[in-house]
Amino acid sequence: MSIDQLRDVKLITALITPFHEDGSINYDALPDLIEHLLAHHTEALLLAGTTAESPTLTHDEELELFAAVQKIVNGRVPLIAGVGTNDTRDSIEFAKEVAKFGGFAAGLAIVPYYNKPSQEGMYQHFKAIADASDLPIIIYNIPGRVVVEMTPDTMLRLAEHPNIIGVKECTSLANMAYLIEHKPEDFLVYTGEDGDAFHAMNLGANGVISVASHTNGDEMHAMLKAIENSDLKTAAAIQRRFIPKVNALFSVPSPAPVKAVLNHLGLEVGPLRLPLVACTSEEAKRIIKVVLEEDVEATRETVTGVVRPDY
């Protein structure tokens, strides 16, 4: 696997995990879900990320999920596997296992959470993972979830490693601009914030790793295409209509809103695993109206939530 599989990919969906009511993974729901995403312009899939509720998935469940998705996708789009933990040794072993498993363009490794490493600790952590495996690594920098933030300078140190191929950046547009300006040519920068996609792409980002593409993939594709064609007027118009939908999709802890919309669409992705809980019926109704534009007035109103969510 190599960076070439992802070089031209702009819209990556961070795949949710469908569950039965008893909390077991609903593998039968995966084919319809994945076909829905591919029909609406998803160009790659991230498995076992935050949106997949990965903290509640066992290691064996993640491997079973990888195998199931690979069988359905059958090479049609690149796949990225979530491999990172806050234990360097565990992350190394997982990256090795995924490399041996095969079929993945890269592994996504999150900045270590809870133990709050220094910048040097972060550097050593990712270097150790990248040194130990042939699996290309994408760093996931999301301080809202892990408390600590990798600085752009640390990121650029790691970008020199031949096996670290990119970052999913969820900090600030200022950091993203700095990274894009100073990164090596073959280092990919993705925004992990749906609400920032318009700005990030105009700064020169390679793409977006998205939650909203589950429900609004056509709009995202149209916006990205307009930016690619230098039609900023059209792209900006799409972004203005898109922002309330992003707000709705992050108005309560994710992925509860996106699951509510997908269930409404008949995709049967089911509930969430505790400690996350589903939207209330009233929350779900409001979110669905905004995200699917079933009520234009609701879309115009302020929806609780922010473009850069804490969830």
UniProtKB/Swiss-Prot annotation:
Superkingdom field: Bacteria
Pfam families the UniProt entry points to: DHDPS
GO cellular component entries: cytosol
GO MF: 4-hydroxy-tetrahydrodipicolinate synthase activity
Intracellular or extracellular location(s): Cytoplasm
Primary enzyme class: lyase
EC number: 4.3.3.7
Signal sequence, start to end: none
Reaction catalyzed: L-aspartate 4-semialdehyde + pyruvate = (2S,4S)-4-hydroxy-2,3,4,5-tetrahydrodipicolinate + H2O + H(+)
This protein's UniProt keywords: Amino-acid biosynthesis, Cytoplasm, Diaminopimelate biosynthesis, Lyase, Lysine biosynthesis, Schiff base
Function: Catalyzes the condensation of (S)-aspartate-beta-semialdehyde [(S)-ASA] and pyruvate to 4-hydroxy-tetrahydrodipicolinate (HTPA).
Family that this chain belongs to: Belongs to the DapA family.
Quaternary structure, from the entry: Homotetramer; dimer of dimers.
Protein name per the record: 4-hydroxy-tetrahydrodipicolinate synthase
Organism for this UniProt entry: Streptococcus thermophilus (strain ATCC BAA-491 / LMD-9)
